A protein has these predicted regions:
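Catalytic domains of carbohydrate-active enzymes, especially glycoside hydrolases
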Residues: 8-50, 197-215, 328, 335-338, ...
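Hydrophobic targeting/anchoring helices
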Residues: 44, 63-65, 199-200, 213-217, ...
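Structural motif
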Residues: 8-17, 32-38, 54-58, 216-217, ...
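Helical hinge/lid and interdomain linker segments adjacent to catalytic or ligand-binding clefts
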Residues: 465-544
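Noncatalytic N-terminal accessory/assembly modules of large enzymes
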Residues: 2-56, 66-96, 100
Length: 544
């Protein structure tokens, strides 16, 4: 094989036929793809390359979503804290204050007294359903007899009327005259049947597609916008938008206890990755992972039966897929592609077990927030490449690629040249690694509440975007991603069950703010954890 050919995927568009051919030749690309907002040209389908087709299971079908409003995806939200002043009755709590009205709509189709919850945050007690009502016209919950100077919140279900990823792309690209895409819930019966049949027909209608690039499967990570269409709350690992009465009733039957909104809301922390997970939230995660894997397998099997590969994008509607969890390996996904923002996010992809190959979508994405007059996409590409390159030398992805509008990138010739250099350098590095295990001084164990499930992602909030409160801790994992050590992610529960899980480590790293999931919080009160760690150190092991 030509050393300057292969292992690279590039984006295309309907009006970029010759430009795609020229770029593919320069970069040595052996695969082309469409993206959100672009279209695969028929003229390129006969090229001697793999054709990736982006496939959306949860959106781009507004006719279905509008005809089945009860099966639109939902998210659990919590209002701000509202204080009842002395002798104030009733207390009125607006649900949608500081939320983007076009994105979300309170779910009043299902029983609100069953699926919503009003909590006295001063005492921690649930307000009986008989003591509050909802006024749909004003959008307010009304508490009839609040306690003086007590604080209250309302936890409620809302329909996702504008897919948050589509909304982000819409805003970033200043799209006009583009219909807002509604997110529908593939887990629910009618929609599930519709999506399965739609995929079968789509495969018949698109015989030139080699790889179905699922973007992604069923549940969006938590991404909520404020009244100014800015990101208000984001948790790349968040399960808050993987809920519906249908799913929650299934969950109740499995676990044998009634569901409470608070199991998701978690005092407003939304069970983000820094929270030590409760038993109920772990139960919910495990249930979701198993059910998501079962339905994923149905769609993946359909692809295989039609002679296509199934690739999963690690992002967007990826919640519940959990590539480092116990069910993912049973699905049969051929490949995983994900965005590479740094070394840790590269390892988040390249370390995934049980797939035929992995692919890193490098940055910058070809969007106008970077590719504008006066912009410097070469600088962003250099930072991205140099940051991730250390991790490639430890555990490379099998392929790299880019996404977005090729026409924007072509306006920057220096950028096109630099990416050509990156592609050639990547192929050289990959060939030199040659599938071998690089030298390692010893194994470092990263100890936290999550273990393998959050491999390389312990301190991530919005993927690779730095977050002030976790930036330094994330730097520890970023360093480890390219250092000459094997890295093993261990949970506190694993140590409690079998302390011998530490035996192949020479150093244990436990980093994070006090009382958080990365550091452990109350886990350390248990001598069944602290004593084995002390014994590990006494025998010569290191503890950071």
């Amino acid at each position: 094989m030509d050393k300057n050919y292969g292992r690279v995927t590039i984006p295309t568009d309907a009006d970029m036929v010759e430009e795609t051919k020229q770029t593919a030749q320069r970069w040595g690309a052996d695969a082309i793809r469409d993206c959100d907002g672009t279209q695969m040209p028929d003229a390129l389908k006969s090229m001697p390359v793999k054709i990736y087709s982006t496939y959306y299971t949860t959106r781009k079908d507004n006719a279905w979503a509008q005809a089945n409003p009860d099966e639109v995806q939902q998210v659990y939200l919590m209002t701000e804290f509202y204080t009842a002043m002395e002798e104030q009755a009733p207390l009125r709590i607006p649900l949608m204050k500081h939320l983007y009205q076009e994105q979300l709509k309170p779910n009043t189709i299902h029983d609100i007294k069953r699926w919503w919850e009003v909590i006295d945050r001063t005492t921690g007690e649930v307000v009986p359903a008989a003591e509050w009502d909802y006024e749909e016209e004003s959008g307010e919950v009304v508490l009839h007899k609040p306690g003086a100077f007590h604080e209250y919140t309302v936890s409620f279900l809302a329909f996702i009327m504008w897919d948050p990823v589509h909304m982000y792309n819409f805003i970033t690209n200043s799209w006009e005259n583009v219909e807002h895409q509604i997110t529908f819930d593939v887990r629910q019966p009618k929609t599930q049947r519709h999506v399965i049949e739609k995929l079968k027909q789509w495969l018949k209608d698109n015989p030139d597609t080699d790889v179905v690039r699922f973007t992604t499967f069923f549940h969006q990570f938590t991404l909520v916008f404020d009244e100014f269409a800015r990101e208000k709350f984001v948790d790349w690992f968040g399960y808050s938008a993987s809920v519906s009465p249908y799913i929650l009733e299934q969950f109740e039957r499995e676990v044998g206890y009634p569901f409470r909104p608070e199991y998701i809301i978690d005092q407003g922390y939304h069970n983000n990755t820094n929270r030590v997970p409760s038993r109920e939230f772990r139960d919910f995660q495990k249930f979701q992972q198993r059910e998501v894997a079962k339905l994923m397998k149905v769609l993946v099997d359909i692809c295989h039966e039609n002679g296509r590969e199934a690739m999963m994008f690690l992002g967007d509607h990826w919640i519940g897929t959990e590539p480092f969890g116990e069910y993912f390996k049973e699905v049969g996904v051929d490949a995983v592609v994900g965005s590479v923002g740094n070394g840790a996010t590269l390892r988040l992809i390249s370390d995934i077990p049980g797939v035929k190959y992995t692919e890193g979508r490098f940055l910058p994405y070809f969007f106008p927030d970077v590719f504008y007059e006066g912009g410097d996409p070469v600088k962003e590409a250099k930072i991205n490449w140099v940051t991730a390159r250390r991790a490639i030398l430890r555990k490379p992805v099998d392929r790299i690629g880019y996404g977005g509008y090729l026409k924007l990138a072509l306006q920057f010739p220096d950028f096109i040249q630099y990416i050509e250099d990156i592609c050639n350098e990547f192929r050289l590095l990959y060939e030199n690694v040659g599938g071998q295990q690089p030298y390692s001084h010893f194994t470092v164990g990263v100890l936290n509440s999550w273990g393998k499930l959050r491999s390389w992602g312990t301190h991530m909030v919005a993927h690779a975007i730095p977050y002030k409160q976790t930036y330094s801790y994330a730097g520890v994992l970023e360093s480890l991603s390219g250092m000459p050590f094997d890295v093993k992610f261990i949970s506190f529960d694993e140590v409690l069950e079998n302390p011998a899980v530490l035996d192949d480590c020479k150093v244990i790293v436990n980093v994070g703010d006090a009382y958080t999931a990365p550091s452990g919080g109350s886990y350390w009160k248990n001598p069944a954890l602290s004593c084995p760690i002390k014994a590990f150190v006494a025998k010569g092991g290191g503890l950071i």
